[in-house]
From Swiss-Prot:
Scaffolding subunit of the trimeric nuclear exosome targeting (NEXT) complex that is involved in the surveillance and turnover of aberrant transcripts and non-coding RNAs. NEXT functions as an RNA exosome cofactor that directs a subset of non-coding short-lived RNAs for exosomal degradation. May be involved in pre-mRNA splicing. It is required for 3'-end maturation of telomerase RNA component (TERC), TERC 3'-end targeting to the nuclear RNA exosome, and for telomerase function. This is Zinc finger CCHC domain-containing protein 8. The lineage of its organism: Eukaryota, Metazoa, Chordata, Craniata, Vertebrata. Component of a nuclear TRAMP-like complex, an ATP-dependent exosome regulatory complex consisting of a helicase (MTREX), an oligadenylate polymerase (TENT4B or TENT4A), and a substrate specific RNA-binding factor (ZCCHC7 or ZCCHC8). Several TRAMP-like complexes exist with specific compositions and are associated with nuclear, or nucleolar RNA exosomes. Identified in the spliceosome C complex. Component of the nuclear exosome targeting (NEXT) complex composed of MTREX, ZCCHC8, and RBM7 that directs a subset of non-coding short-lived RNAs for exosomal degradation. Residues 552-562, 635-645 have a biased composition (Polar residues). The modification Phosphothreonine is found at T474, T482, T488, T495. Residues 410-430 have a biased composition (Low complexity). Phosphorylation at Thr-495 by GSK3 is triggered in cells entering mitosis. PROSITE patterns: ZF_CCHC. It is found in: Nucleus, Nucleoplasm. One of its GO terms (molecular function) is RNA binding. Disruption phenotype: ZCCHC8-null mice have a small brain volume, cranial deformities with domed-shaped heads, and severe hydrocephalus with ventriculomegaly. Defective turnover of low abundance RNA polymerase II transcripts is detected in developing brain of knockout animals. It holds the Pfam family PSP. Residues 48-83 form a coiled coil.
Length: 709
């Protein structure tokens, strides 16, 4: 029967909701059914009407009580309601400063006037600071989420300007101050959203009753030693370190205090201070984790079962083999080259070239991933479409990947042979010319005679070439990449100076001549010219050896007693481009008139030539043999008849020479750069003055002994 009675009053909510429209009161129409009509007919004494009247009286009493409460709420709400019609231009300054609720307390009653004066003094102080320093008075304090906005009186129509300035009437703090404590209901706003910059946010320190964990009944409480604070080992102060200690150093005290500190740190941590970690311990701790094997815990965490592939397998098909596990299977070489005196071709590197590290892989450490690099077990579906992936790739199979790693990794010998093949493929490259020149000009190679001729293009002739140690009279080889020096032997007596037409630069056609152009007579004449130049270089070291009309060039000091002037290697490529002899090509009769008549038969000429080659090998040093082999045999590019060139291997074998393994004393001065004097006027001509004294030097004496032998 209570369904037909309304409870509550809309007037209670008028203070919170704006009165937009007059809400009509609901009208309840109650229809009686047949049973109720029968009951009403039975209530002849009016019992039903009495109960209804009693309910109406109770409802009216409740309504009166709610009206009284509504009036009380309206009166209290007026205290926290902003006044209407106030325009605020600056929300940070023009709004209300604070709202004070004076309670019924003797202190607030007594100091009521002082509180108001204090507020007014704060306003004056702020205005003065704003005039002096604007930045000091600028704060970015946004209302906190717990702030409350003061509502305006709803009986007055709101203006747009007042609606836009509701931020000025936000309550950002509500504190009840008691004599012993205060109760903050809203908190405080943060300065620049930073609690450290906001005053009043210090964390209170409470008294700690228990410093250790309370043990269970029947167990002893284990007190853990505290870790000592770092302090000065010299004086014991905690305010500075030992290096900043003003007291004099006491080594014994410092050592003792340091030992105590280390022991205390070890006891506090429950283990040794200097603990060592071993790989075996790590393997035991993480031994249950194996790559490619999914445990039951991991399956539960991923939400997969034994009958499905994990989701990361489908992602691995797109990304490839994990690089971390590939690094585990990597066997990296240090890249250091060890030299034992043998010039191995494997360790041969060019100047400025960095030796690459040889990286190999242990194929047994490749991880098996079912569904990625090995086939999926039977009964497990491949759901790559559902995960947006790709099917299994044949290139990602374990055996294919292993063969790929083996094929892409070159051994050092393969890499060096590839380097040699690349140099052989380009005959005009400077690297090849340097290598061939050094191989042709080596004195040790000049003394070797082989019965079996190996084709120069074969791989065995390059990879398996015997390289004996250098003889004592041979200087160390120049570093690779150094341009070969051009030497000009001394000119014989009576030789006119060079003319521009006779210079080697003016005769480019001579370098392009055919090898079969010289006759035997011309070869013998050129050989005599070389021997005359060598004899003058060996025997005549005085100033009278060089005629006065001979111009001094940069290489005219070749007649000095330095024994290394003919020992340096001359590349073959340079020998083919320019003639070895720098003197002008004169007729044979004008150069050497005292020489024997050349033989007309080729056989006799060849015999004479081979005999003189043997004499040159016996008399001259390794440098003479170098000029003999590198200059005379390569003289077949001048003009002449179609005489066939004489091959170096066709001459009779020479007896091997025995040399001391210790280099000559004069070889230790090779490569020393002379000191250039600043005052060139005083140093000019000094060498010519002391040249006669240098003839008796130990170097020349040793050289003369070798010549006599």
């Amino acid at each position: 029967m209570a369904a037909g009675v309304d409870f509550g009053d809309l007037e209670l909510f008028e203070a919170f909701d704006p009165p937009e429209e007059s809400t009509p009161k609901p009208v309840h129409t109650r229809f009686k059914d047949d049973e109720e009509e029968e009951d009403d007919d039975d209530d002849e004494n009016g019992v039903g009407d009495a109960e209804l009247q009693e309910q109406l009286r109770r409802c009216e009493a409740t309504i009166e009580q709610l009206r009284a409460e509504n009036q009380e709420l309206k009166r209290k709400l007026n205290i926290l309601t902003r006044p209407s019609g106030i325009l605020v231009s600056n929300t940070k300054i023009d709004g209300p400063l604070l709202q004070i609720l004076f309670m019924n307390n003797a202190i607030s009653k007594q100091y009521h006037q002082e509180i108001e004066e204090f507020v007014s003094n704060l306003v004056k102080r702020f205005e003065e600071q704003q005039k002096n320093d604007v930045e000091k008075t600028s704060f970015s304090l946004l209302p906190q989420p717990s702030s409350v906005m003061l509502e305006e009186d709803h009986k007055v129509e709101e203006s747009c300007a007042v609606k836009n300035n509701k931020e000025a009437f936000s309550v950002v703090g509500s504190v009840l101050y008691f004599t012993n404590f205060c109760l903050d209901k809203l908190g405080q706003p943060l300065l620049n959203e930073n609690p450290q910059l906001t005053e009043g946010w210090e964390i209170p320190k409470y008294q700690q009753v228990f410093s250790h964990i309370v043990p269970l009944e029947g167990q002893e409480m284990q007190v853990k030693a505290k870790r000592p604070k770092p302090h000065c080992f010299n004086c014991g102060s905690e305010e500075h370190q030992m290096k900043e200690c003003p007291m004099p150093r006491n080594a014994a005290r410092i050592s003792e205090k340091r030992k105590e500190y280390m022991d205390a740190c070890g006891e506090a941590s429950g283990q040794s201070f200097q603990q060592r970690y071993h790989a075996e311990e790590v393997e035991e701790r993480f031994g249950r984790f194996k790559p490619g094997v999914i445990s039951e815990e991991l399956q539960d965490a991923l939400g997969v079962t034994d009958k499905s592939l994990p989701p990361f397998i489908y992602r691995m098909r797109q990304l490839g083999y994990p690089p971390g596990w590939l690094k585990e299977a990597e066997l990296e070489n240090s890249g250091l080259a060890l030299y034992d005196g043998n010039d191995d071709a494997d360790g041969e590197t060019e100047t400025g070239e960095i030796q690459n590290k040889n990286v190999t892989y242990d194929l047994s450490k490749l991880v098996n991933y079912p569904g990625f690099n090995i086939s999926t077990p039977r009964g497990i579906p491949d759901e790559w479409r559902m995960f947006g992936s790709i099917p299994m790739q044949a290139c990602q199979q374990k055996d294919v990947f292993a063969s790929y790693l083996n094929s892409n990794i070159q051994s050092p010998s393969m890499r060096s042979s590839g380097k040699r093949s690349s140099s052989q493929s380009s005959p005009n490259s400077p690297k090849k010319q340097r290598k061939e020149g050094s191989a042709a000009a080596s004195p040790a190679d000049m003394e070797l005679d082989s019965d079996v001729e190996i084709p120069p293009g074969s791989q065995s002739s390059k990879a398996f070439q015997f390289q004996p140690p250098l003889p004592p009279g041979t200087p160390p080889p120049l570093p690779q990449g150094t341009p070969p020096p051009l030497f000009t032997p001394p000119l014989p007596k009576g030789t006119p100076p060079l003319t521009p037409s006779d210079s080697p630069q003016a005769r480019p056609a001579a370098s392009a001549m055919d090898e079969d152009a010289l006759t035997l007579e011309e070869l013998e004449e050129q050989q005599r010219q070389i021997w005359a130049a060598l004899q003058q270089a060996e025997g005549g070291n005085g100033d009278s050896d060089v005629p006065g009309d001979t111009p001094l060039t940069g290489n005219s000091v070749a007649s000095s007693p330095c024994p290394n002037e003919f020992d340096l290697p001359v590349p073959e490529g340079k020998a083919l481009e320019k003639p070895v002899l720098a003197e002008p090509q004169e007729p044979a009769a004008s150069v050497d008139t005292a020489g024997p008549e050349p033989s007309c038969s080729p056989a006799a000429g060849a015999a004479v030539l081979s005999q003189r080659e043997e004499e040159a090998a016996a008399e001259g040093g390794p440098g003479d043999a170098l000029l003999d082999n590198g200059g005379v045999l390569n003289m077949n590019m001048s003009n002449g008849s179609n005489q066939q060139p004489i091959h170096p291997d066709s001459r009779p074998p020479m007896a091997p020479k025995t040399h001391s393994p210790v280099p000559d004393m004069s070889k230790f001065a090779t490569g020393i750069t002379p000191f250039e004097f600043e005052n060139m006027a005083e140093s000019t001509g000094m060498y010519l003055r002391i040249r006669n004294l240098l003839k008796n030097s130990p170097r020349n004496q040793q050289k003369n002994k070798k010549t006599c032998e």
